[in-house]
Every structure is written in structure tokens, then in C-alpha cells.
């Protein structure tokens, strides 16, 4: 079975996508054709979107699902005229909030992802710059400023996790990869020892690590099953010996890895 899913927003569409995807992934036997339409900022544009939704209804014979985060009441009403099952994610929550807070919403578009909060925006940029300049052990001098330092073998998810934490949470995240040389008589590298309280380890199943590395450098010692097993075994033993917290990243998305790391490390959002 196939169903069309529209994610509609008067901003970037990130919130509608996030909430919509979280819900539809619970239905594994249905194939979803996802369409995101951001910046619906007028009733004229909303009407053109309605035509597109109705066309999908005519072609498929089933109502498209519509997840929308639209602030303007007139634009929301225009979308609700579509032949679709509409989930108005804004009004679901804003009414009860107005009642509880005893204050009317300002109905301002773009509050979530805008740059109105200059301090927050500047901190996000600083965090991204920090993650990029302290990626892959390139620069260790700034580790004293880091909120967290991810460590682990090559290709276990350190870099994307650091970038995600920087972008979404404003966390100053560095990462350090263990090389083949580090694994000889393996112990915690001296450069990391002064920052031991900031260290958080990632590990990964050896079979999955081999698959990832084979895509990058096929038929190499680096990607061999034996090498992957050795590195994973040694690094996990070191984590336990040094009492460094760690998680296995094999079955988790970058978003899940990042949130688990922050929760275990006790770090809070900065933006």
C-alpha cells in the first residue's frame, strides 16, 4: 500500500518533517511517498498546494496525509479544504497552551529557526566551527574548551555526531580517532589523558565496521575482518579499563547517537 504524505510549513519545514516522520515510521507495512513544501506564506500559495494535494488524491484514490506547522489561521484554513487527512500540528498545541498560560499567541512565523536570537545563532556558528576545526584529532590544543570529546576507531560515527550536536544543541564537540599505531599495546593516548572527564567512547559491531570500511578502502588491511575485530576488541577493553562511558553505535541513527551521548554525559542544550 502506498500513501502520499505532505509536510507543510511557513518556515523551513524541519518541524513538520520531524514530527511527521516520527509518526509514520510506526507503520512499517505502508510505503509513504513524502513531499515537503516549505515557506507557504500566503493563501495564494496555499491554494496551489491544495491543488497538488487534490491531484494526488485523484491519482491514488486515498486521502494524502498532511502534517502542517502553519501559524497563519487563514493559511491553515485554506489547506484544510484539501481532500486529505490533515494534522494541524500548530493548533493542536497552541490552544491548550493559550488556556494554560492565559495569554494569546503572537502568531509569529519563523520563531523556531530564525536568527532573531543573535546570541543563540552566534553560539551555533561557534559550535559548528569548533566541531570542524577539532575533527579527526586534527587540532587538540582547544580540547580544554570542549564540552565533550568523542573517541573511537575510524568510521564509527564520531564526525557526524559531533556536527549534529553542534548544529542542534550548540555543544562544543571534538573527536579523536584511534589509529592502528594507537592499538599497539593499546592504552589511552597521552594527549587525551588531561581531558579524561570529557571523553565519551563510541564502538561498533566489527561486521558493520568492515562493511563501512570496505566501501571506502576495499580489499585493504584497514577493512579486513581481522583488523576490525582487533580494533573493536581493544578499544572496548580500554574503555572498560579506563572507566570511560561508551555506547555501541551500530543500530542507531546519528540523531539517536547524539542524544544518547548527551543524556549519559549529562550535557544540556546550549541553544
From Swiss-Prot:
<keyword id="KW-0808">Transferase</keyword>
<comment type="function">
    <text>Bifunctional serine/threonine kinase and phosphorylase involved in the regulation of the phosphoenolpyruvate synthase (PEPS) by catalyzing its phosphorylation/dephosphorylation.</text>
</comment>
<keyword id="KW-0723">Serine/threonine-protein kinase</keyword>
<dbReference type="GO" id="GO:0016776">
    <property type="term" value="F:phosphotransferase activity, phosphate group as acceptor"/>
</dbReference>
<protein>
    <recommendedName>
        <fullName>Putative phosphoenolpyruvate synthase regulatory protein</fullName>
        <ecNumber>2.7.11.33</ecNumber>
        <ecNumber>2.7.4.28</ecNumber>
    </recommendedName>
</protein>
<keyword id="KW-0547">Nucleotide-binding</keyword>
<feature type="binding site">
    <location>
        <begin position="152"/>
        <end position="159"/>
    </location>
    <ligand>
        <name>ADP</name>
    </ligand>
</feature>
<keyword id="KW-0418">Kinase</keyword>
<dbReference type="Pfam" id="PF03618">
    <property type="entry name" value="Kinase-PPPase"/>
</dbReference>
<dbReference type="GO" id="GO:0043531">
    <property type="term" value="F:ADP binding"/>
</dbReference>
<dbReference type="GO" id="GO:0004674">
    <property type="term" value="F:protein serine/threonine kinase activity"/>
</dbReference>
<dbReference type="InterPro" id="IPR026530">
    <property type="entry name" value="PSRP"/>
</dbReference>
<dbReference type="InterPro" id="IPR005177">
    <property type="entry name" value="Kinase-pyrophosphorylase"/>
</dbReference>
<comment type="similarity">
    <text>Belongs to the pyruvate, phosphate/water dikinase regulatory protein family. PSRP subfamily.</text>
</comment>
<dbReference type="GO" id="GO:0005524">
    <property type="term" value="F:ATP binding"/>
</dbReference>
